[in-house]
A protein has these predicted regions:
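Conserved alpha-helix/loop element of class I SAM-dependent methyltransferases that forms part
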Residues: 132-151
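N-terminal helix-turn-helix DNA-binding core of bacterial DNA-binding proteins
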Residues: 2-43, 66-73, 142
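A short acidic, Gly/Pro-enriched loop at the edge of an enzyme's catalytic core
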Residues: 207-219
């Protein structure tokens, strides 16, 4: 009872509601919230602490950045938060202005990321070669996927199409989705050069692809999640695309604190731990079936590969639909 009372009391404040509405769109740092809300940093920090004390949000430290996000796990509090968000006025001018500024913040990030990827595309294949044993990672991905053959593969955030090449001999058809035209230009050239006529790439938002549900028996997210504002959204989209007995392979860096990955490589997130991935998979109706770690060179963070599959209840729903 006391916890419910504290939650309701904390939610009964307009500025904290603004923060909650923004965090419902994804994780944000204090500096980003300050920029969006036009409030002082001490005030924003105070509101965040109140929301954290009430069990509504949690903070995640990565390197020198600290992200705030809505906390999951307590069903009662989550229900109160969901109800509160659902009852917020949809056309409130203050909330609408906040969302516009949120899009501005994301657009700034996107411009910087696009410039980075344009440079990567012009020098294709060099990113991370000195840090990560790509051959070992690709070999493990093939091993975890199994021999197939797969009817339809979808690679979300395909970049230069490397994952499509890796699985080209095991798929009947393949599609790669990416927003960056420079990367897709390289991908098309490489696929054509290798006569992979059964594989295509197209421009699109990996969080909301133009593809039908339940198409793929193999979906990959290779070194993609660390660039995203909302990694869970990509996993939800991957689940939508999966057949009832399909598999999702996620490859990304293990959680680390090397801030230069943000400045040098435009990473939004500094890797992930098993708990993060497991929670996101579970929320999307998937189960974490296997985890492998690939050791990297020198002091650089290791790469992990997570295999997700539709949970039993999710398989049943997909089969009926």
């Amino acid at each position: 009872m006391e916890r419910h009372a504290l939650t309701l009391k904390t939610l009964g404040h307009p500025e904290r509601l603004r923060i909650l509405a923004l965090l419902s769109r994804g994780e944000l740092t204090v500096s980003e919230l300050v920029q969006i809300l036009n409030l002082s940093q001490p005030r924003v920090t105070q509101y965040i602490k109140s929301l954290e004390t009430a069990g509504i949000i949690e903070r995640l430290k990565e390197g020198s950045w600290v992200f705030s996000r809505i906390k999951r796990g307590n069903a009662a509090i989550s229900a109160l938060v969901a109800t509160t968000l659902a009852t917020l006025p949809p056309h409130d001018p203050i909330l609408e202005a906040d969302l516009r500024r949120l899009e501005d913040v994301r657009a700034e990030r996107s411009i910087a990321a696009d410039a980075f990827f344009a440079n990567v595309a012009n020098d294709s294949g060099t990113l991370g070669d000195e840090y990560i044993p790509k051959a070992n990672i690709e070999s493990m991905l093939r091993k975890m996927a199994g021999k197939g053959p797969f009817d339809y593969m979808i690679d979300l955030g395909t970049g230069t199409g490397r994952m499509l090449e890796v699985f080209a001999d095991r798929v009947t058809r393949g599609s790669g989705i990416d927003n960056n035209v420079h990367m897709l230009k390289v991908a098309r050239h490489k696929l054509a050069e290798n006569n992979y006529n059964h594989i295509r790439v197209r421009q699109g938002d990996l969080n909301s692809t133009p593809l039908e549900s339940g198409l793929a028996d193999l979906v990959t997210l290779h070194q993609v999640l660390h660039y995203l504002d909302d990694p869970q959204s990509a996993i939800i989209e991957a689940e939508r695309l999966l057949m009832p007995h399909g598999i999702l392979l996620i490859a990304d860096f293990e959680a680390h604190n090397q801030d230069e990955f943000r400045s040098d490589y435009a990473h939004r997130r500094l890797g992930f731990d098993d708990k993060d991935i497991d929670n996101w998979l579970s929320s999307a109706g998937l189960k974490l079936s296997r985890v492998e770690t690939i050791k990297t060179h020198s002091t650089r963070p290791n790469v992990k590969i997570w295999l997700g599959q539709p949970a039993l209840n999710s398989q049943s729903k997909k089969a009926k639909s």
